[in-house]
Amino acid sequence: MAVAVAAAGVLMGSEPGPAEELAKLEYLSLVSKVCTELDNHLGINDKDLAEFVISLAEKNTTFDTFKASLVKNGAEFTDSLISNLLRLIQTMRPPAKPSTSKDPVVKPKTEKEKLRELFPVLCQPDNPSARTMLDEEDVKVAVDVLKELEALMPSAAGQEKQRDPEHRDRTKKKKRSRSRDRDRDRDRDRDRDRDRDRDRDKDRERDRDRERDRERDRERDHKRRHRSRSRSHSRTRERTKGKSRYRSRSRSQSPFKDRKDREKYGERNLDRWRDKHVDRPPPEEPAIGDIYNGKVTSIMQFGCFVQLEGLRKRWEGLVHISELRREGRVANVADVVSKGQRVKVKVLSFTGTKTSLSMKDVDQETGEDLNPNRRRNLVGETNEETSMRNPDRPTHLSLVSAPEVEDDSLERKRLTRISDPEKWEIKQMIAANVLSKEEFPDFDEETGILPKVDDEEDEDLEIELVEEEPPFLRGHTKQSMDMSPIKIVKNPDGSLSQAAMMQSALAKERRELKQAQREAEMDSIPMGLNKHWVDPLPDAEGRQIAANMRGIGMMPNDIPEWKKHAFGGNKASYGKKTQMSILEQRESLPIYKLKEQLVQAVHDNQILIVIGETGSGKTTQITQYLAEAGYTSRGKIGCTQPRRVAAMSVAKRVSEEFGCCLGQEVGYTIRFEDCTSPETVIKYMTDGMLLRECLIDPDLTQYAIIMLDEAHERTIHTDVLFGLLKKTVQKRQDMKLIVTSATLDAVKFSQYFYEAPIFTIPGRTYPVEILYTKEPETDYLDASLITVMQIHLTEPPGDILVFLTGQEEIDTACEILYERMKSLGPDVPELIILPVYSALPSEMQTRIFDPAPPGSRKVVIATNIAETSLTIDGIYYVVDPGFVKQKVYNSKTGIDQLVVTPISQAQAKQRAGRAGRTGPGKCYRLYTERAYRDEMLTTNVPEIQRTNLASTVLSLKAMGINDLLSFDFMDAPPMETLITAMEQLYTLGALDDEGLLTRLGRRMAEFPLEPMLCKMLIMSVHLGCSEEMLTIVSMLSVQNVFYRPKDKQALADQKKAKFHQTEGDHLTLLAVYNSWKNNKFSNPWCYENFIQARSLRRAQDIRKQMLGIMDRHKLDVVSCGKSTVRVQKAICSGFFRNAAKKDPQEGYRTLIDQQVVYIHPSSALFNRQPEWVVYHELVLTTKEYMREVTTIDPRWLVEFAPAFFKVSDPTKLSKQKKQQRLEPLYNRYEEPNAWRISRAFRRR
């Protein structure tokens, strides 16, 4: 109103034109908005100050200059406030009118400026100090604690130091040297301290008991000495003591309140104290004797219920009418408190979830404890009860803030409840006016009869998604704006897309047919034979019959015949055979002739783009040439690979050529495995590992040359490395960057890297004839097999290469092709069928390099791995159906899915080129020329534009890169994907309300895991189950723990069932690892129980590395013992997005999108079907199956993900119930829909 009046006054006085009036109104609106921002952040609402800030922003249009001018004028604004003010002023300030012309010249905004206005959260200023912020905070906390310790030294020592100034100076010097020694020796002492933890914990318990006795004696002496003092003076002293205790509890920076705490922790354990207390979330349960703020939620005749604040979960307690106030008896509770009133209460006791509180012992104004003796008695009784309840509990668990969840369920079961018949009787008596409603046990004066708190687990709890957007994303999420899906297909209605959908349907039909055949075979087994199999002492005849019948359909001859024929049985030899020495092999590579030119090009240019076909020797030779040229004298030579198998195999080969042991001068680093040493000069690694090194050392100071190999694959890590290394080479002029690619799209790389020169390695290429189909093919798998048979029967000698999408498709094609060739008879020339996919053992993959025997032909059926990663000699014919399986992010479900999509034109050219390596060849494209031209993208969509970016955004934020819009991506990811990633990180607690990284987020970025696994592992530290969670995370990181051979499926299932846990699959994996550990990591034990020994050993290595990371960050590894509820809570805290509830009709429904899913048949919970579960991942076979499932309590979802879930309003119908269909009970006399009202009217 004031703004409007002021504006009106300005307009009346000067009588300007309409445009000027509008401009003044806009200016007044801007001033008001700036005043509001200043008031919100600083508590200053000054119009003159707002106008001064606006004038500064008009003169300084960039963030840096604006910030500098504010600092120069004495302003102490945060970066986020400065950014918001500048954006606000530049958006709302009316444009100045030029004096020379009537119409202002508006400069068109660039695309990036429009995006900055539309998504301000993605262009926050970078924070280069974010990498070291965590360490600085740790040091600051340690310094504050040391100051506290020094301030709490006895006063006598202080007086003595005052008398002796020289002694004080000497002490200061000693302190400085002692602090330096402490910093220097802390790492060395940490291992020694960990070994002494158990003994020290026992000593602490003894010291605690002695200290308690001493304190009682001191109190007795204190009373005896001061008995003569006046009562008013003692009351004042007690009040002061209570105030200081209350203040110290609310202050997070005062760790040691008295001498007992100082003796308990000591100086050497300051770091441990910091991580346990400063990093720890609010406690889950109230502590007896402590004082809490609370709010009155309901009023009863016998007292009131108060909800406690400052706890991790919702916790209510009862203040009995006798505990309301000290003065006199209370007749009516409503006279003392009212609903919604803020009060201060002391916790007297709690049993299960029933908590007894007191208001009369607390000063409601200051929070002072008016009866501290009662507090000591309560705590003493609790300690005695706890020690008597569980004497075998490890003492070191007392240092961890973990709830006693194992006792909750037991205590809750002991509570006496009113049975249903008793409730019915009471209701009938109320209806007959024998009892009044007020006497009903569950009566509430304001809301009427409600269910009791104790009946929570019996009632059907409804959980809903929180519809509120994160504060920094308001107006930008999918709730408030339509997000366009990622476009990975050029024409969704074209013939290629239709063929992909048709093939998916056919594959599903084939799977269902095989499953039906297996079920029919199992059903053919007569009933009642299982008792002979299970009986430990059966008669011989019955046992034999049972064994024979159980083996039906599972005999060794059930293994596909084509596999026996393809791999040649036990006599097969693996590996590419050659008669040349290693030196001759190196000299035969195409790159050898260009060795000198290549080294010179690297010397002359800081960035070099190298183009060469697969097999030219780029990966193995360039690093050796540069090492021989002396570049290793300045640092290491690093080479990245997109796949971990490639990094390992290439490093092994280069070490053989280099003449050293693997891990010495030549080594490799992959996730969870480091095979390097201080002598390593050539280091191969996955691109993700180099990205993690950038997190620690952004300038990569230990490297002289970085080589990004296979850059054409454009993995998500490679694209991020492009932007990071582009900055690094500008800072480090002595560093060299080499980017290699097997495709011919080098111009794009060159333009991105400052017009870097291109070095081309000429390869052996021959002309390739390309043939298209006349009509689109609906079943490309069948068309591929027909084409292979036609080539084999009609074309001249030469091997065939077929491209398919995945393992299942390849196995099916091999089986069908083998049967068809077998049906042609023995007169047809032999066709050797060889599959290639990543899950196949590497020694079997190498069989494709063996030449076919005379008079026969081999056909290699492979995934897109054969496009660029493999070079197979002798290929003259290529069959290209035109499809590939890609990982695509589904924004609806929030997960990545493998989807069959058409290839790009660049991939089609690459596949055709495979036929021209040995001689002139042919490429059979099983799609039309029009489809190639109109339905295929020019290049394939980079992974960064079609996958989930939560992990990438977390890494960039940890590096201090907050301005994601200004980050130099080669192909920028969609804004919608970045917004979704930040929303996910916010719900995990990794981002705060301003979109900046939290302390938890920095911890998460330190682990080489997915964000959900990181959250799960870090929360397990606070829940006191990190020992178990380390094992579970390690087991989840490996694949195929259980082995199920087709000839012993029943026995394998029986052995696996021994490890099944009622809580779910995560704890089943934990049981497997612990059993292996208890059997001394035995390989025979693995074979006996059908468990992959190699997978368990890999899990063991992963666990060791994760343990090292936790130790480095001082995160305690604590076991929860038999309290598996803690493990379930930790799993729920990380994977709450993957929660599902049992559906009344079929399977389960996910909470996030109501998708129908099912528990996988191999799960430990398959036959249990619990009400609520969380899953690790979804797998699409015949149905959408949940893998690695664990049961949960729905209340945990609200407890650990309050930003994502909430309890639905019980007075309204939830969304989930609205979607449910009403199914009437079966009635043989009526049709199913006869109960509907519409049918009743129709009958009339």
Swiss-Prot record:
Its main location: nucleus. This is ATP-dependent RNA helicase DHX8. SMART domains: DEXDc, HA2, HELICc, S1. Identified in the spliceosome C complex. Interacts with ARRB2; the interaction is detected in the nucleus upon OR1D2 stimulation. Interacts with SRRM2. Interacts with CACTIN. GO terms for cellular component: cytosol; nuclear body; nucleus; U2-type catalytic step 2 spliceosome. The keyword Hydrolase applies. The lineage of its organism: Eukaryota, Metazoa, Chordata, Craniata, Vertebrata. Its EC number is 3.6.4.13.
